[in-house]
Amino acid sequence: MKQCMDAENLHRRLRTIVGQVQAIDRMVDEDVPCEDVLAQIHAAKAALNKCGGVIMQGHIQHCIRDGLQHGDADRIIANFAKAVERFANMN
């Protein structure tokens, strides 16, 4: 998996998400208005979705391409379809 994605980019994004979630946790204790907490939750979810997109892009560009060139195309496509379905259902 490491070879098919920009790990540095992903780690940077994930650190940002960790910071967002920690901030949301603090907001709960600080009596921040619900609307503001919900806005931050939305931002964290969007950032996670972006991470999924980065992983999906790397998977297509490297793993799928390599698998189609050197493997069983039907199996590769079926596995990819399942991954896309799972990713699409995360929202």
Feature-to-residue mapping (PLM):
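Solvent-exposed interaction patches of small proteins and small membrane subunits
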Residues: 1-91
